[in-house]
From Swiss-Prot:
UniProt source species: Rattus norvegicus
Domain Ig-like C2-type: 266-332
LRR repeats (start-end): 60-81, 84-105, 108-128, 132-153, 156-177, 525-548
Cystine residue pairs: 275-328
Transmembrane segments: 527-547
Name of the protein: Leucine-rich repeat, immunoglobulin-like domain and transmembrane domain-containing protein 1
Assembly behavior: Homodimer. Interacts with LRIT2; may form a heterodimer with LRIT2. Interacts (via its N-terminal extracellular domain) with metabotropic glutamate receptor GRM6. Interacts (via its extreme C-terminus) with the scaffold protein FRMPD2 (via the third PDZ domain); the interaction leads to their colocalization in photoreceptor synapses.
Keyword Transmembrane helix: yes
Superkingdom of origin: Eukaryota
Gene from which the chain derives: Lrit1
Positions on the Lumenal side per record topology: 22-526
Repeat keyword on record: yes
Lineage: Eukaryota, Metazoa, Chordata, Craniata, Vertebrata
SUPFAM superfamilies: Fibronectin type III, Immunoglobulin, L domain-like
Domain LRRNT: 22-59
Length: 623
């Protein structure tokens, strides 16, 4: 009777109905009796129209499965009432993000399965709320990286599946933890073993995969891989290659090679700064100036046979502005290393000694050659990059910036001062027949022949006051074989040389000239021409007048005498133009027979004074 009353009381309270009313309408619930007599509830929700986790999940649920639904996100603390939850399965949903509060209150959780979702990141810090978690399944998601701090929340795991994601590398801290697995706090009776799934990821096979490759070789006895044959995804040359076939080296931070720390170079020279470093992977090399100014040169990169990286800074023509400190940096993902190289650009006071062919350098070309007042070698200086020549110090001029440019020493008769390749013989044959053409007292023109030169061959002209060291350089456009030097001082002796740009002239390409001689020679020629013309005019004018007068007199005589003149065969009296004993010209009378002879002689315009021949004076007569 008492049993019947109890049943009626339970029915009145609706006990059985209330117990099953906790199961969500879109889910199925089941109750299991465990071996120790306790009960475990399992809730399975697989409705494809489900977009959020159900709100009325029984609090005594031990296993919750939300699978193949349209759930995109899990709000924070959704599962906090499920304090008895031990297994949380969320496979093949549309999850793209998880809250860091999602696992709040799940202190007894041992399994968390999230395969087949769209997770790009995972809230690793949320695992601190699950101290008993042993299984984490994240396969078939979109994870691309694992942060180094994740290692602090994975120490107690015995199963971790990261396969079929977008992982390219693993943090070194995590690999080091796996290589030195220790006894877990909840598995103190036996050694911890970790089952690891890393297959089907696009691994980048470089030095950062060195530790993982060695883990696969069995260095960690407590590490078990679901699939041990991992393959490279990149670089392209290693795509598809198994880890077991790789020969990787351990990563190393950049280490600079010792070298020159200070360079002193003359103005206008070419400077090559070189810096080398080692590292794995090969470091990226770069140059910069300590003062922040831009580089005035070209950077080249090289890799030597031993794997060292080299960078070269080429400064073609250094100036005083290039002086300073240059910083070479070698950098890879492990760090950076720097070194400092100081460059000092100076104006040398003495020439640099070179080995050259002995012998006198300068000699004047042509007749009347004059030996130059130089020793075996001439040391000179030139101003680099002067667009137009300026007057030398011998001629007062307005101060100019161009004139204040520093001069550079070079040795004239040393092959290779400007060029390292062409020989002296080749350069000598290039420029031939150098000549000076006069212009004015302040300018001169040079012409030469270059039969072996091409349309792209450019020449340079070096000139200076004879006997001085300071030389100036002019650049001649490619293809031209003449140039005019302006700004010269009048009545001054100069020396000028023509050579292929970048080469040193030899004595065959040099000429000595004087501005007054050039102009005076041309003026003298003009004066001679004028004197010759004047003398010819003076000599030819009197005979011409005499001939005209004689013709006029004959005509008058004809008119007077009529036909008697023809009968006698005589003409008017002729005058003799000869030389008197004192050398002066005189006029005299002659006979008619002598007149006939003179009229048949050569024209008076061609007559000349023949001088004294055979001891007696020879006179020629004109009319």
């Amino acid at each position: 009777m008492w049993v019947a009353l109890g049943m009626l009381w339970l029915l009145a309270l609706g006990g059985p109905h209330q117990a099953w009313s906790f199961c969500p309408s879109q889910c199925s619930c089941s109750l299991h009796i465990l071996s120790d007599g306790s009960k475990a509830r399992t809730v399975v929700c697989s409705d494809p129209d489900l977009t959020l986790p159900p709100a009325s999940i029984p609090p005594d649920t031990c296993k919750l499965r939300l699978e193949r639904t349209a759930i995109r996100r899990v709000p924070g603390e959704t599962f906090r009432p499920l304090s008895r939850l031990e297994q949380l399965w969320l496979p093949y949903n549309a999850l793209s993000e998880l809250s860091t509060l999602m696992l709040r209150g799940l202190r007894r959780l041992r399994e968390l399965r999230l395969p087949g979702n769209h997770l790009v990141t995972f809230p690793w810090a949320a695992l601190k709320d699950t101290p008993q978690l042993q299984l984490l399944d994240l396969q078939a998601n979109r994870l691309s990286t694992l942060p180094p701090e994740a290692v602090h929340f994975l120490e107690n795991l015995t199963f971790l599946d990261l396969s079929n994601n977008q992982l390219m590398r693993l943090p070194e801290e995590l690999l080091d933890t796996w290589a030195h697995l220790k006894t877990g706090p909840y598995l103190s009776s036996r050694r911890t073993r970790l089952v690891l799934g890393l297959q089907d990821n696009p691994w980048v096979c470089d030095c950062r995969l060195y530790d993982l490759v060695h883990l696969l070789d069995g260095w960690a006895s407590n590490l078990i891989f679901i699939e041990a044959r991992l393959r490279c995804g990149s670089p392209r040359s290693l795509a598809g290659v198994a880890f077991s076939q790789l020969e990787l080296r351990k990563c190393q931070s950049p280490e600079l090679r010792p070298g020159v720390t200070s360079i002193i170079s003359p103005l206008g020279s070419t400077v090559l700064l070189r810096c080398g470093a080692t590292g794995i992977p090969g470091p990226e090399m770069s140059w910069r100036r300590a003062n922040g100014r831009p580089l005035n040169g070209t950077v080249h990169q090289e890799v030597s046979s031993d794997g060292s990286s080299w960078t070269l800074l080429d400064l073609p023509v250094v100036s005083l502005f290039d002086s300073g400190d240059y910083i070479c940096q070698a950098k890879n993902f492990l760090g950076a290393s720097e070194t400092l190289i100081s460059l000092i650009v100076t104006e040398p006071q003495t020439s640099t000694e070179y080995t050259g062919i002995p012998g006198a350098l300068w000699a004047r070309t042509g007749e009347g050659a004059e030996a130059a007042a130089y020793n075996n070698k001439l040391v000179a200086r030139h101003v680099p990059h002067v667009p137009e020549p300026v007057a030398l110090a011998t001629k007062p001029s307005v101060p100019s910036i161009k004139e204040e440019l520093p001069l550079q020493n070079f040795q004239m008769d040393v092959p290779g001062e400007f060029s390292r390749e062409p020989s002296e013989h080749q350069e000598t044959q290039m420029v031939r027949s150098l000549k000076v053409v006069g212009d004015t007292y302040h300018s001169v023109s040079l012409v030469w022949k270059a039969p072996q030169a091409g349309n792209t061959t450019a020449f340079s002209v070096l000139y200076a006051v004879f006997g001085q060291r300071d030389m100036r350089r002019m650049t001649v456009e490619a293809g031209k074989t003449s140039v005019t030097i302006e700004g010269l001082a009048p009545k001054t002796k100069y020396v000028a040389c023509v050579c292929v740009r970048g080469l040193v002239p030899t004595k065959e390409q040099c000429v000595i000239f004087s501005t007054d001689e050039v102009v005076d020679a041309e003026g003298t020629q003009r004066l001679i021409n004028m004197v010759v013309i004047s003398v010819a005019a003076i000599i030819a004018l009197p005979p011409t007048l005499l001939v005209c007068c004689g013709a006029l007199r004959r005509r008058c005589h004809k008119c007077r005498a009529g036909g008697s003149a023809e009968a006698s065969g005589a003409y008017v009296n002729l005058e003799r133009l000869g030389h008197s004993e004192d050398g002066s010209e005189e006029l005299s009378r002659s006979s008619l027979s002598e007149a006939d002879r003179l009229l048949s002689a050569r024209s008076s315009l061609d007559s000349q004074v023949l001088g004294v021949r055979g001891g007696r004076r020879i006179n020629e007569y004109f009319c």
